[in-house]
């Protein structure tokens, strides 16, 4: 935590409720988040399985996982969730699959899958064009 400035250290140590960290690119947001996770687990005794860090890109999620892995001792990171919003959503859907009425092995369409399905249905309905 030595590399953090006083405001960043304050954010890491704040545990009395939600905290919003707003800062520009390259300002150390990922460092604050990873240090906060380590602080919660190592200092506050929070089980890592009760912590989730969510980001927008796979690259950022990988980087965050690597950084947290370097900060946590032993198997302290076991159960920690670090993922993208899409990965977390899919994980929740898979965990609740039965309650949602989904079959095992369901798939989620991306934009290309959707276009292909619509094209195939139009061809089926109206003939090849």
Give, region by region, the residue ranges found by the protein language model.
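P-loop NTPase Walker
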Residues: 1-104, 108
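Coupling/switch/interface segments within P-loop NTPase motor domains and analogous charged loops
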Residues: 112-129
